[in-house]
Amino acid sequence: MPQDPSTRSSPARLLIPEPRAGRARHAACVLLAVCFVVLFLSGEPLAPIIRSVCTQLAALQLGVLLKGCCCLAEEIFHLHSRHHGSLWQVLCSCFPPRWYLALLLVGGSAYLDPPEDNGHSPRLALTLSCLCQLLVLALGLQKLSAVEVSELTESSKKNVAHGLAWSYYIGYLKVVLPRLKECMEELSRTNPMLRAHRDTWKLHILVPLGCDIWDDLEKADSNIQYLADLPETILTRAGIKRRVYKHSLYVIRDKDNKLRPCVLEFASPLQTLCAMSQDDCAAFSREQRLEQARLFYRSLRDILGSSKECAGLYRLIAYEEPAEPESHFLSGLILWHLQQQQREEYMVQEELPLGTSSVELSLQVSSSDLPQPLRSDCP
């Protein structure tokens, strides 16, 4: 049974991941407060507790410094290729910020106290801490978890999806979208049908989250038919003379056999994600491809949402393919989005007269410093 396109294309249904909100740090603060409460209720003397905390803190910071020394042993061989020959840049990259040193000094002060009842000297305690930290590093037990890697790449905007989204925007959408209305206006002179659908004069970008892209849309759905090409945009870019950019205009046939024009294309960077997951050299799994496809949609949505040049000139249509093949799923999805745009346009038009009258009123009032009659029949 065919599923309602609105449910398959809604953001809630697609489960687009939003940026993480720092709840892990909040949880750490809560657990820290719980630990303080437990220590307070234990009734133990305060001085030994502070000394133990300082020794543990020193051991942790010592581990950070030892890890930096191990990183330095590798990075010194990449001094010129990665760090422009700057030894200071290598040191800053390998070792933590300055406040780590302060924590190390504060924690290390605990080792200056006399040895405890167990007879272990401060020197032995420091040596054992170094031994444990180096053992952890040698066994590779300090690797970041998958969640930490994901958060790090997303927060620094250095994942594959973010790079593809920016490349798609800078190299293509920012070039062609500002001229879209002009191209549609020119094409409408020979295709009067377009004038009745000005509310959908946008580039409709299909974003299949499974990365299944058809090169020929007419083969994907028989209700989608090619109509014409929009006027070409010709530019000289990156040494290529008269580089050509163009869009294709399609008509979508609805259940009443009516035709709706639509400028339509797939988001081509998704082909890159699909090819990467099929190439062993890329080491890109299917799960990573699906995650990056969703992040690509989110990144592109955010980039276009903040672009003044592209405002009102595009429509992102993200969707998941149905589990069971549906011959007219794609055309039904596109028609639903076209109807949504038409409703949105009507809502704007209903609010427009109120806005226009208020503008006229403000112009009449501000035309002179003296009070003026608002009625035209008053002298």
From Swiss-Prot:
Subunit structure: Homodimer; forms a homodimer in absence of cyclic nucleotide (c-di-GMP or cGAMP). Homotetramer; in presence of cyclic nucleotide (c-di-GMP or cGAMP), forms tetramers and higher-order oligomers through side-by-side packing. Interacts (when phosphorylated) with IRF3; following activation and phosphorylation on the pLxIS motif by TBK1, recruits IRF3.
Database matches in Gene3D superfamilies: 1.20.5.5200, Stimulator of interferon genes protein (3.40.50.12100)
Organism name: Gallus gallus
Record family assignment: Belongs to the STING family.
Modified residues (Phosphoserine): S366
UniProt motif (pLxIS motif) ranges: 363-366
Primary site of residence: endoplasmic reticulum
InterPro entries: STING, STING_C_chordates, STING_C_sf, STING_LBD, STING_TM
Membrane topology field: Multi-pass membrane protein
Name under which the protein is recorded: Stimulator of interferon genes protein
Disulphide connectivity of cysteines: none
One annotated Gene Ontology cellular component of this protein: endoplasmic reticulum-Golgi intermediate compartment membrane
Domain description: In absence of cGAMP, the transmembrane and cytoplasmic regions interact to form an integrated, domain-swapped dimeric assembly. In absence of cyclic nucleotide (c-di-GMP or cGAMP), the protein is autoinhibited by an intramolecular interaction between the cyclic dinucleotide-binding domain (CBD) and the C-terminal tail (CTT). Following cGAMP-binding, the cyclic dinucleotide-binding domain (CBD) is closed, leading to a 180 degrees rotation of the CBD domain relative to the transmembrane domain.
Role noted for this protein: Facilitator of innate immune signaling that acts as a sensor of cytosolic DNA from bacteria and viruses and promotes the production of type I interferon (IFN-alpha and IFN-beta). Innate immune response is triggered in response to non-CpG double-stranded DNA from viruses and bacteria delivered to the cytoplasm. Acts by binding cyclic dinucleotides: recognizes and binds cyclic di-GMP (c-di-GMP), a second messenger produced by bacteria, and cyclic GMP-AMP (cGAMP), a messenger produced by CGAS in response to DNA virus in the cytosol.
Top-rank taxon: Eukaryota
